[in-house]
Amino acid sequence: MISAFCPGHVTCFFQPITSLDPLSAGSRGAGIRLSLGTTVKVNPVPGNAMVTKVNDGTGSDDIIRKVVRSIDPSGGYEINVRHDLPVGQGFGMSAADAVAVAICMCQITGRSKTEAYRIAHVADLLGGGGRGDVAGIMANCQQPVRTVAGIPPFGKVEDFRVNVGRVTLAVLGSPLETKDVLSEREKYVDIRNAGSDAMQEYLERPSLESLFKISNRFSAEAGVRSRETDAAIEALEEKGFMAAMCMLGNSIFTNAPVSEARSVIGDVWAVSCNAVPEEAGIIRTR
């Protein structure tokens, strides 16, 4: 049995980029790597069946299966996945799943970690998950900025040494499907244009304050905020905190402590975590 942990990743703003080569596709954008994420256990078993269990057994395993079969088309495996954060709320759980499973599978089959990231990126992208979370996770810095779309070395991720520290994540509504949002042509164009402007502005003056400010301008111009998200951001800002929407979810990230965030926006699901540079990797082998 092999176990791996992968950090989650919040995208703050993004510019979707398409390409015939999935390794060069994804998005430009800025994000935050999280101390909470996904823990995966992979156990090779006789035969060719794949049995997966995600959290309480109700989670989707489509991207996990894509990763496994990209590496071993016919082997038998038992796979257990545990999420620290909700799925479909912009916390990068599908990407973290893909990376953690790919690292385990590549360890089992003697492949490199670089190959694991490439496989995870393609599976997450084609499976309708994140558009750049895997590249952000691969960067090993608190606040990765994806200046060129795709997975390195095709894409490029830079570290501008922005210290994020501790953040609170709060969920305000039902999950969103990234693929559903981006499938609307008009919405896609709005997001792409807003993302291009956001990237240009952020690269001129990267800082924690501008990360929140530009994230809010992006979500407003792209038209992706729900009423609940909009109200929560406004309420926290009125109390002197910074807050912005997680892409793409009915959720926010803020510098307000959990207790103070809840006192402002209500008794919602919320958790505090750190922005971290530590890489994803194997945590146990047997």
Regions found by a protein language model. Name each.
Residues 1-87, 273-274, 278-286:
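ATP-binding N-lobe of GHMP and related small-molecule kinases
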Residues 4-6, 22-23, 31-34, 127-129, ...:
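Solvent-exposed alpha-helices and their adjacent loops that cap or buttress functional pockets
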Residues 10-16, 38-43, 133-138, 142-145, ...:
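Short beta-strand scaffold segments in enzyme catalytic cores
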Residues 74-84, 118-125, 228-239:
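Short, hydrophobic/aliphatic alpha-helical segments
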Residues 91-115:
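DPxDG-like acidic metal-binding loop motif
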Residues 114-158:
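Alpha/beta catalytic cores of group-transfer enzymes, especially the acyltransferase/condensing modules
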Residues 154-286:
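C-terminal nucleotide
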